[in-house]
Amino acid sequence: VSDDPLALENQVCYGLALAARGIIGAYRPVLEPLGLTHPQYLVMLALWERHPQSNRQLSDALRLDPGTITPLIKRLEREGYVTRQRQAGNERTLDIDLTERGIALRDRAVHVPLIMIRRLGLKPADLPALADTLHGLIAAADNPLPLTDAERAALTSPH
């Protein structure tokens, strides 16, 4: 690790981006036999936890824009894993529910977490601490501390 504060290897954002890209890539061969992409897998995980859900509820749960969720749901519908239906009494709300095929897919997908833990060289005992760290980072990113006057000055003043 370099002493240079601007060295690429020292940047948290760079390390997180590489880790995210690498982990998502490692999921590809695991999810392929299930006929799912990683984003589709996330939608299915949310629906296996609770179904039906509205498009908005799924969007909120996954922290994705509804416009990003819609094509994923349409593809899952074409694959026969989910159905989309207008909510009774509210034509503007679309409910997403699992089909029997989507429910059955869970029996195969249940192996994914342990496979991924092994593929990434982790131990199940490592997961609680890793999850705590990730949840802490997510919470910090959701509510970053405001810039101080000194930080603002350092960023705007020529040196």
Please provide the spans of the model-predicted regions.
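Acidic/histidine-enriched, glycine/proline-rich intrinsically disordered or flexible terminal extensions
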Residues: 133-159
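N-terminal leader segment of winged-helix/HTH proteins
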Residues: 1-34, 128, 149, 153-155, ...
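Short amphipathic alpha-helical/adjacent loop interface patches that line ligand
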Residues: 20, 62, 66, 106, ...
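Charged, amphipathic alpha-helical coiled-coil/dimerization segments
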Residues: 24, 74-132, 142
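Short glycine/proline-centered loop/turn elements that form peptide/ligand docking sites
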Residues: 34-37, 68-71, 75, 147-150
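N-terminal helix-turn-helix DNA-binding core of bacterial DNA-binding proteins
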Residues: 14, 21-68
